[in-house]
């Protein structure tokens, strides 16, 4: 008689007699959903499931019913243990989570040195103790762990079982095995013999660069520190350039920060080894639109030059302490605007040399962009010059002396200071109702305007557009010629701008501008970017679809090649008083001084509509640009000290009441707009009172949504006041009001 082998032993999840403590030890190297089934040592014949979730191990007794069936939850009973495990691997049904990954058995033989596929990077997952989850990655989750052998804290990237991206995950590991540089995150090992797959890398103390920039102490992370960070990233990318790798997802969210402002490039999920000049992504591949070069959006073509474009956007993120690129612009509009020669403006306080480098990275033709070797050399040159912080301090101090705001402008921090005095002076010639969003659209209507006003912002500086020649090593001779021609062209634009009408100026500049390479068919242009919004999730509060409506209307109706004053088609439908509070609709508890102040300053309003002088369209662009750290300050801005949390909350309630009364046909559409304008003005004044930086970001985004919704209601009052469209429009407005209220209450 031969005793039959216990059929349970063939299952990877069955561990036989194992104590509770031993089960917890075996699961210490697992992740959410790691489990085992064991026989109780203290109670022979009794079995339990041990399941790990969020750093804890949960134990569930497997019960036997009177009819011999097995169950954990009495509602679901099974004939065999295998059936029970299979059921709970698809639905939790009483467990903390579903059963995903069987824990490795203690006596599993090693195959090191025996397998023909032996890999020196492969390590036993039992060598790693998993701790808490740090966040999500390209294909799975990232955990903090400890490498037991060395008591070393590590980061462990895992693959989500349901992503079916095993091949892509293993490609990332393959890339990391080939690279080693002080500013690239170092691979320590992999576990790829069985799921769950692990990539183990060094642990970076301060997490990703995007969150670090948004939450850092700006006295400590000064202009020089920001420059040092950019230098390190350019060094890492120069190394990848030499090794013929492309990253394809270069952004602040994919860089990590360690001690002493050490920065390393990470997240190689989209990286590829180049075998030719370009890499063509497969159809349906998703990319972060705002960081992706035009040729990549249009044709799915990637090269090291498309990484250079992304580096320019990353520089802009650094210079703005983590602002989301193209603020207020919908994803579907980005490619169209870039094609019309729109580029993001120079962040406040950003040195001209650094901005010129950004603009060089954003050349439409990939061949016109600098190499990473040139970029790195340019940063090394700038960093060795102590004048970089002096330049920032000088620019900020210069603005401070214009109107006695020097006390706000002392520290040499890049984008955190506002151009208060400059705004006050320039607002005399510009209508208060022109919002940053509208001004950006005027840039699309006249590509030259974006360049002209940048010149005005840096007037008196000796650098100008010729700065890249000194800020970075000279590129090949044809590039130098192009740079000089570009510099001459800019001088021509600047002088023509002051002496000619915008309509004529625009026509001439259109002739000067070299034609970009032919983009794809119209459907491809608009379609490509719109397909890939998913990776925008890495942004903090990116623009919402709400903003798309008015922007799309204006973009369609505006042809930059037509004669006439730029932005004419845009100004007509935009009434002049969106941000202006109305004294007739005071929310309860509102102090008298904030309301009376704006209502006594109506002087600029006649110029805000169709009668605005055409030349004034160019003047306020630099002063009213959107800044992450400061909202624009129209002349009627109320002193922030007079606007309290209660005032804002009362104003939100007043707007909700006006909407409710309008729905019941007890109040007019204009009453809703009036209450909305009051709320907008109070919010703009209140934003600087918010201490927590993350809340401040969210609040600014909410203000932008509110402004966009008010504009839509104001442009289309007939639609908004009748039929089912009213509910939809007011629901958008109510959503932004609720968002504002929630943030203020935090």
Swiss-Prot record:
Residues 13-103 form the SH2 domain. Residues 592-602 have a biased composition (Low complexity). ATP binds at residues 134-142, 157, 202-208. InterPro entries: ABL_SH2, F-actin-binding, Kinase-like_dom_sf, Non-receptor_tyrosine_kinases, Prot_kinase_dom, Protein_kinase_ATP_BS, Ser-Thr/Tyr_kinase_cat_dom, SH2. Keywords: ATP-binding, Kinase, Nucleotide-binding, Oncogene, SH2 domain, Transferase, Tyrosine-protein kinase. The active site is at 249 (proton acceptor). Residues 128-379 form the Protein kinase domain. Gene3D superfamilies: Nucleotidyltransferases domain 2, Phosphorylase Kinase, domain 1, SH2 domain, Transferase(Phosphotransferase) domain 1. Pfam families: F_actin_bind, PK_Tyr_Ser-Thr, SH2. PROSITE patterns: PROTEIN_KINASE_ATP, PROTEIN_KINASE_DOM, PROTEIN_KINASE_TYR, SH2. The keyword ATP-binding applies. Its EC number is 2.7.10.2. A motif (Kinase activation loop) lies at residues 267-291. It catalyses: L-tyrosyl-[protein] + ATP = O-phospho-L-tyrosyl-[protein] + ADP + H(+). Residues 389-613 are annotated as: Disordered. SMART domains: FABD, SH2, TyrKc. GO terms for molecular function: ATP binding; non-membrane spanning protein tyrosine kinase activity. Residues 498-508 have a biased composition (Basic and acidic residues). This protein is synthesized as a Gag-Abl polyprotein. Belongs to the protein kinase superfamily. Tyr protein kinase family. ABL subfamily. This is Tyrosine-protein kinase transforming protein Abl. The lineage of its organism: Viruses, Riboviria, Pararnavirae, Artverviricota, Revtraviricetes.
